[in-house]
């Protein structure tokens, strides 16, 4: 005779446990939204800065469009993502206050504080770009765009490994990421200069024929 399989209902969770899971779920959602906004925002800064190299009226049209996109992204997506992330983190600590005694959490909060500074600095850069006061080049913004990647890696590793974080492996990983990012930025800059030189030569050749 085959054994009968009985369906059993899951045991009800306590209110604090349920609250913890809800806070954690929305904390993760907030992180995804926040980082997506930060990555795209600084990418828009790159395009905004590079628009200065375009002839009129394309230059003015592009800069106004990027300014509008930056404001909407920062105010509607990035900042709400940051608020949800921080608010849900506070909720997690409220449901599990003993976690404040963990050394890894203090380090993680330090990197989160750096990320918050980065967030508000991006807001300041956005205003300078809108006012035409930013002196940053597209290549410099590309470098700035890589900063949250490093912070994200460290924060996630701390959240996963906690006090067992392998420092040697983490250090080498960060060094490798920095080298790879710097190399990609330099390669793109070289390609862009080569493309611009080729375009200039083609324009000169076309003018000579006319």
Swiss-Prot record:
One of its GO terms (biological process) is protoporphyrinogen IX biosynthetic process. The chain crosses the membrane at residues 22-42, 74-94, 103-123, 141-161, 165-185. InterPro entries: HemJ-like. Its EC number is 1.3.99.-. Its main location: membrane. It is found in: Cell membrane. It comes from the Bacteria. It is an enzyme of class 1 (oxidoreductase). GO terms for molecular function: metal ion binding; protoporphyrinogen oxidase activity. Binds 1 heme b (iron(II)-protoporphyrin IX) group per subunit. Disruption phenotype: Attempts to disrupt this gene in the wild-type background of Synechocystis only allow to obtain heteroplasmic disruptants. These cells accumulate a substantial amount of protoporphyrin IX. Heme binds at residues 27, 108. Pfam families: UPF0093 (PF03653). Its cofactor is heme b. Pathway: Porphyrin-containing compound metabolism; protoporphyrin-IX biosynthesis; protoporphyrin-IX from protoporphyrinogen-IX: step 1/1. Keywords: Cell membrane, Heme, Iron, Membrane, Metal-binding, Oxidoreductase, Transmembrane, Transmembrane helix. GO terms for cellular component: plasma membrane. Homodimer. Can also form higher oligomers, most probably tetramers. Interacts with Sll1106, however it is unlikely that Sll1106 is required for PPO function. Catalyzes the oxidation of protoporphyrinogen IX to protoporphyrin IX. Is involved in the biosynthesis of tetrapyrrole molecules like heme and chlorophyll. Does not use oxygen or artificial electron acceptors such as menadione or benzoquinone. Is functionally coupled with coproporphyrinogen III oxidase (CPO). Is essential for growth. Belongs to the HemJ family. This is Protoporphyrinogen IX oxidase. The lineage of its organism: Bacteria, Bacillati, Cyanobacteriota, Cyanophyceae, Synechococcales.
């Amino acid at each position: 005779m085959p054994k009968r399989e009985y369906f059993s209902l899951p045991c009800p969770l306590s209110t604090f446990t349920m609250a913890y899971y809800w806070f954690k779920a929305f904390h993760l959602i907030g992180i995804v939204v926040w980082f997506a906004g930060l990555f795209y925002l600084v990418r828009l800064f790159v395009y905004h800065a590079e628009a200065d190299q375009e002839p009129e009226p394309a230059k003015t049209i592009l800069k106004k469009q990027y300014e509008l996109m930056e404001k909407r992204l920062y105010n509607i997506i990035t900042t709400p993502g940051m608020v949800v992330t921080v608010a849900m983190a506070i909720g997690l600590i409220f449901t599990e206050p003993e976690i404040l005694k963990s050394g890894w959490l203090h380090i993680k909060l330090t990197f989160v504080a750096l990320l918050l500074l980065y967030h508000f600095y991006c807001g300041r850069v956005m205003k300078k770009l809108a006012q035409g006061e930013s002196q940053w080049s597209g290549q410099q913004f590309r470098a700035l765009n890589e900063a949250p990647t490093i912070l994200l890696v460290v924060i996630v590793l701390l959240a996963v490994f906690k006090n067992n974080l392998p420092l040697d492996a983490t250090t080498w990983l960060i060094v490798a990421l920095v080298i790879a990012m710097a190399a990609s930025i330099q390669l793109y800059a070289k390609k862009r200069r080569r493309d611009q030189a080729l375009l200039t030569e083609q324009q000169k050749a076309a003018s000579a024929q006319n």
